[in-house]
Amino acid sequence: MPAKPEAAVITHPLVVKAAAEYALEKGGIVKISDSPAIGLFAKILKDGGYRKAFEGLDVDFKEFKTSVKIDIGKPFGFIDIAKDALEADAVINIAKLKTHAQMFLTLGVKNLFGCIVGLRKPEWHLRSGIDREMFARLLVRIHRAVSPHVTIVDGILGMEGQGPGKGGAPRRLGVLAGGSSAFAVDVAICRMLGADPDRLPTNKAARELELTDYNVDVIGDYEGINNFVFPIQDPLTFGPRPLHRILRKHLVQRPAADKNLCKLCGECWKYCPAEAISHDKEKVSFDYDKCIRCYCCIEVCPEGALKAVETFPGKIIRRLLLTH
């Protein structure tokens, strides 16, 4: 989404520039691509400082628009992945270190969801529904299909709190991590932040598929980050199956709008995969029975007007669990 680098929503252009300069020095033809869920690609490049940062460099900014159907295996079957990403001689995957209310963190593996073209992303959110683990397995399969040669995660200025959109808080972490394995990079960053690697669903999915064993060799400075603020997360399903919907509705944190910030731009209801958002001339409204808690609306809100909030019963139960 369109954002300035200091918001810590997008990868900083100078990190991407450094990778591009290296590739150019090695004789590469460099294309910088993405498929934004929201906003014009040109506006993202302008607002994010990419156009200015890359002045004078022989690179091509090219939005992913054409897909190729790839069979990524059961239960997903065929998925449309950006043709340019699949046909490139080498893919350098450059992600932002930021929190994610649904998937815990956005790191190297999840970043490749950007290779799903445009509005096909909500379709896969909806197909995965409330199953966080299934969505993680989807992301791991996409990673395997794209098979990046190098993954870099920009955490020089990262995001903590209720990310991944403007509801999160920028924090200077001074972290720049990279490696030939996105799984290894993600595991190392989790440990650096003080989190068990299994808390990141894509790590767990990759381990179950025997794509990583969490044994990571780290070269360079590796100091832990103190007091990193992770997103509040609730299990999306719990209790007896017949009660899943009602328990999720009343206990799991939900997206909510700040009327003072909301400009009724329409991005949230246009992008909502579950079609759970409606609006009138004064406000947006949420159907929490339909809402799958993917928090896409929060991520795409250009005003930072949407946040994940705890329900009152959810707060009570969380406090009881913390005191026992």
Where in this protein do the model-derived segments appear?
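N-terminal and secondary-structure boundary signal
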Residues: M1-K259, K263, W269-K283, Y288, ...
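Extended, alpha-helix-rich binding/interface surfaces that flank or overlap catalytic cores
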Residues: I292-R293
